[in-house]
Structure formats: C-alpha cells, structure tokens
C-alpha cells in the first residue's frame, strides 16, 4: 500500500518545539525545520516547499540513516525524527527544471506576474514564461515547469486514465481539450495566492520568426491567463499514481517499474490524434528552422552583375580598378586584379567578405556588397570628395595645423576600429584616405588579404605587395611567414602623418624604386624629419617618430596613438567665440539731458 500523500486527519494542535531536523531540498538547497509534537513530516515541510514552488504531491521524502536513504511516508510523525536528516527529491515523472532568465524590454502591454503592475523593463523565463520586475525577483520560485514537456505528460496521463486500468476521478464537466488549455472562471478556478506558485498557461503559438539577435528562438509562453491550480494538482496526483508501489529495496514511489508502464499504458502505435498533429507540426517547424539556418549568410550580400551598372573609370591602384557605378544609387565598384581565381581563392574571398560586411564606422567606407562573377569586385559607398593624396600632392590644398591634426585623429580613429575587428589594412596610404563632405575622413580598400597576396595556383607566395613608400621594413624583407601586423599598419600611418606634417612624399630625392626597397629594408633610410612644418606641435613630432621606428615592437598601437592625438587637440589654444550682445548705436552723450550738457559747458 502506498502511504497517504495528504496531511493527517488530526485535530490536535501542535505543541511546543522540541528540536530541529535538517532537510536537503532539490536544486542543492537545504533548510532546518522545527520539530513540534503532534505534527507530521507533511506539515513541517509544507512552508519550505511552497516558498520554492514545490508541493508534497510532486516530491518524495527520505530519511538519511548511516549514509543510506530510506523512503518515509509524509504522514510520519516528525517528533521521533529529532536530530536526523531528511532528503526531499522531485519525482522523476514531474518535469521540473531551472529557470532560464533573460533581460527583456516589453514593447507590447505586459504586467508583472507578482506585483501585477505595468512592466516595461524586466526579466522573463524562456522556459515557463514568468515575467517580473527586478525588485520582484525574490518572489520567483527557484524551479519552473517546461510547459511543452508537461503537455506530453498530460497526453500520456489522460491516455492512461481513458484505458481504465488506473482510472482517477476526473471532473465530469472538463473535456480533454479543456484540461490542456487555460480555463476561465469556473468552480475549480482559484484566485492567485501570493504564497503559492502558479504556472503560466501554455499558449502553444506557432514558431516565432527568425530574429536577428542572438536570443534563442523559443516558443513564447503567454502568462495573461494563469492555469487552474486544481488542474495542476490533479495532474501531479495522476503522475504519482503511475507507479506500482515501492518494493522491498526502498525504491521511491514515483519511479514506475517497466512492468507497470507496460501494463498501464497503451501501445506506442496507438497515439492520440492531437499528439500526432503536435509532433507533425513540431517536425515541420524544425525543417523550416534548418532550411533557414543553414543558408550561407553571404547569399544576401553577393550582388548579381546584371544589377550593377559601371559608368566611369576613376583610377587604377595596386590591386584593382575603381569605377563609378549605379546600384540603387551612386556606388564605387572596385574590380580586383585576380585572373582566373581558384576555388581556394574564391572561398577565402567570401570568408573575408563575411568580415567586411560587419564593419560600420563613421571613418570607414560603407561596405555594400560584392560580386564573384565574372571576377572579384567590391561595392562600397560613393565618396564625393577627393583622396588625401590628391589634396596634398596634386591640388596643393592648404590646410591649417588644426585641420591637419583633425585629419590625423580621424584616420587613427578609423584604423583603431579596424584593428578592434581584427582587420589589418595592409595597404594604408594617402590614396586610400578620402575627405568626404568637407573634412570627414573615410578609409577605403581595407582588408582583402586574399587579393593582396600573390598566389601560385592554390598556394600563396611570400612576396611583398602594396606601395613601396608606405611599406614597413619587415614587410619589405618578408622574413616572417606573415609580416603584416597591426604594427605594419602603424608604420604606414606614420608615413601618412609625414605627408600631413610636411606636405610632401618621403624619399622624393631618390628616383630608384629598388634602391628605396633595399635601403628601407636594411634600416639605412628613413623619412627626413627636418622637413616638418615649424608650427607642428612637439607631441605630434614625437608621435611621428615613434610610428616610424625600425623595430615594429617599438611602435605604438592605435589606441595609444588616438589617445595621444585627442590629448593634443584638447591642449591646443582655441579662439573662443564671444557672447553676442545687442548694439544700441548711440553714444553716452545721447542719453544725458540737454540741461546737464549746457551746465557742464559753463563750468570753467
């Protein structure tokens, strides 16, 4: 016989406390309860279980005697157990889980499930759907119920009830569909009690849309209509009666034996139509998610060549030709110099595009898409302004020192962003820095390690590529397997600073390209710092010298460079604009009475 699950029918009042019992609860929790004469284990643990969202119907209690667990009935008197230890475990049939809280902003109308007040910023359990304010978190039970798992348990429970072998008394006015859906006001509905845990109702909505955030795509659970607590208690009781009773080995009551399962439940082939429909819909939803999830993300960024119109050739660089084009507006299309790309090159190029498509910064040219047919091409925003090289060395634009320092700051800011994204430019120079709409710096032609590497078949060759004047010594020597680093970009930035602070290119007195490569690679040649403008601040001169160091370990990184320039900008003297005041356009004499003026003239 199974021990009774309810409280003992005793009218005796509990007497004084006689001791304590230590109780180990689920989820690695523990408590100490007071032992009183005339009280049972059921009564003593009632409060400790309810504050944790549990009840006696879904748990089993053991006595811990010499390290071994012995099942104990709930109606056992607590007084003889003074000084002992009890263990409470959740029945295996009851699918209780831990909460999965996420911070959420509720843009639709929502209310806290505890204080019932309006909720905008709060938390939500992805498993059971409970939502609450931060200051209401102490009222949330430590365990929750996955309602999708409960629905399957409900189906099996009702199927067993309809089999006749272990029938329970089901309320006659409730059908199967009514049992599985939230009920409105009825004789069985109880009002929410703040001390009792009320599970949210399963709404079973269709699969939510694929969101662009990293939040898991889970079924949203509505909590507007709380589930009838009497139904939950009834179902939990049906779970507990699924067991055939504990044997002599002290097995818990809630653990059904294989014999009891096979004798009480029907064949697995005879399933309810509702359960079959649910499993079919879940399978269809999984297929939809799989089809959407495994699509290559580059699919949405590759532009068909038929949609792009090339208008005018702008110029040719080291790695490609730039055209002005039309694709939903003016764009810049750079057709890269890659003849007959191999499969390895194509895959490496697409991998780089997945990195570049995530770049968004005010000082970086906006990446808009790419093309792989008939050749590699990159589509970026169109910049109306000219390059920094054109301003300094062709148009001979005159900038004051404050403007030059601001251009240097914006360039360092854009490079700092690229390095934070682990993108090495590899070809930073004044030709790839554009002044857009005034003095807004836009850095282009960044990344593209696939295109900027010499290939021999499927293997990259270790040869220097790029513009000689902006190459660091280690890039020219090519002694390392991969000489390109953050510090090599810093050296190129130092040459750009040299152009800004002198208005000329380095090594202009040497006409041989091979001689420049040899002498810079050996460390015999460096930019002439005597040409720097006389009004250049000393801090900028020191920064330029540090960026052009021969040893790359001695060069600063862009976070330090940016901080130095920003500090320099704040220290520069500025002409503060005076506050505007009205001008009366009259002299002080106009305000004096005429009699006073005549009297003043008579005074000797």
Curated annotation (Swiss-Prot):
Zn-finger segments (Phorbol-ester/DAG-type): 98-144
PTM statement from Swiss-Prot or TrEMBL: Dephosphorylation by the SHOC2-MRAS-PP1c (SMP) complex consisting of SHOC2, GTP-bound M-Ras/MRAS and the catalytic subunit of protein phosphatase 1 (PPP1CA, PPP1CB or PPP1CC); this relieves inactivation and stimulates kinase activity.
Residue intervals of the RBD domain: 19-91
Record-listed Phosphothreonine modification sites: 181, 316
SUPFAM superfamilies: Cysteine-rich domain, Protein kinase-like (PK-like), Ubiquitin-like
Catalytic residues in the record: 427
UniProt xrefs under CDD domains: C1_A_C-Raf, RBD_ARAF
Binding, Zn(2+) 2: 112, 115, 133, 136
Identification of the protein by name: Serine/threonine-protein kinase A-Raf
Organism in which the protein naturally occurs: Rattus norvegicus
